[in-house]
Curated annotation (Swiss-Prot):
Region of interest (Disordered), residue spans: 488-512
The protein's required cofactors: heme
Catalytic class of the enzyme: oxidoreductase
Lineage per the UniProt record: Eukaryota, Fungi, Dikarya, Ascomycota, Taphrinomycotina
Modified residue annotations for Phosphoserine: 363
Keyword Phosphoprotein assigned: yes
UniProt EC number: 1.11.1.6
Annotated compartments: Peroxisome matrix
Official protein name in the record: Catalase
A GO MF label: catalase activity
TM region positions: none
Amino acid sequence: MNSKDSNTVPVYTTNTGCPIFNPMAAARVGKGGPVLLQDSHLIDVFQHFDRERIPERVVHAKGSGAFGEFECTDDITKYTKHTMFSKVGKKTPMVARFSTVGGERGTPDTARDPRGFALKFYTDEGIFDMVGNNTPVFFLRDPAKFPLFIHTQKRNPQNDMKDATMFWDYLSQNAESIHQVMILFSDLGGTPYSYRFMDGFSSHTYKFVNDKGEFYYCKWHFITNQGTKGLTNEEAAALDGSNPDHARQDLFEAIERGDYPSWTLYVQVMTPQEAEKYRYNIFDLTKVWPHKDVPMQRVGRFTLNQNPTNFFADIEQAGFSPSHMVPGIEVSADPVLQVRTFSYPDTHRHRLGANFEQIPVNSPKCPVFNYSRDGPMNVNGNQGNWPNYPSSIRPLAKVQYEPDEGHEKWVGQVTYHMDEITDVDFEQPRAFWQNVLGKKPGQQDNFVKNVAGHLSGAISPVRERQYGVFTRVDSELGRRIREATEAEVKKMEEKAPKPINKGEPHMFQGSS
């Protein structure tokens, strides 16, 4: 908030630089007379005020972030030619944004929800965005389901309230979601203590390409150096009321006092030959690559050491997209990732404008030359007098690219495909229940309690269907979820006043 010269008090001006006598005074006819339209400053203030809000993100609306740098600590040039990893010790500036997913900008940081984990690297060859979550999997693997799923995480269109029946109705009909559900309703995955104490994941499978044109499949893991820490349902609920900005405050204050948070990047790498023989579909967003199958390899470390100067300019206007790629890193055949490469920049153009890449936080540090021109809010010189077409007089050079043609040849007929549910979809959720939660004292009990408290708000047919999904994971889990949930339902029914039906039926009336 300080001026450039701390000894000089800035003069208040209009947005065009004209000094103003008193910003809180209005031109009027006498002391008590009407306001005059000639007071252009007053008119400008209100016109700008009327336009201060931009559309919030349709997902990940509530978030926080900071600036920092990534340092390469280990050589992976045999996998990728990307300049960020070109040599050990190489440093790359970056900005990070962490967020909840389903809520609006005003919702609590401690809501049970996945957390967004978005990173923007200002590399020598352009912007590279890694747009992940704090969970290694997601609720779906068929991209057409994404908007429908997100609708169920939002509000009931009739009463604009969160609705447990909507939430579980979708999940119980789409059982591939169960792996993410298991993580979400654990204390670590669904209610992390704060952004500093959670890991981040690419979730998707990406491709590394080296300087020989050879490619490898990879998954990215950002492991917090602060250690993971979660909240119980009760702790999260208490913070919801006492400090809904808890995670934002924790991140900001830690950086302000010099306690800079950091994360270590590891990758899992698989050759195309290994991928063809692997027991799981490597493009399935609902599954992980077990570390015993594909070991983690350390790559580097990023540290956040600078808070935003202005939240709106630096964080709210930041636009992250999986389509922001650089040489040496490419999109795989993961269908959800491929659709995200369209959806994310599209929503930024709606939210921030056609030239959102020119906003300082979104601008690359390297030169930009192409044939894109004009459009609203084009403020970077519009590439001067360079031709806006492929010119023989002032040509642009082209980089060399020789793809590996030995793999990823796709031949087939056009079909409308949706993956079917099989027993394989329950293997990893079962391992999470038995081998992860089962080895941490109290975590299975907390999981059952967390699910029961939420699922009890859904109508009976939806609850029954979801019990069946949990039973396919583990019969004991299904039994415990059913007993705990129905006990919660009974308590709610005993406390609830008798309903009075008037007018039109609600969205789910008659279904229970």
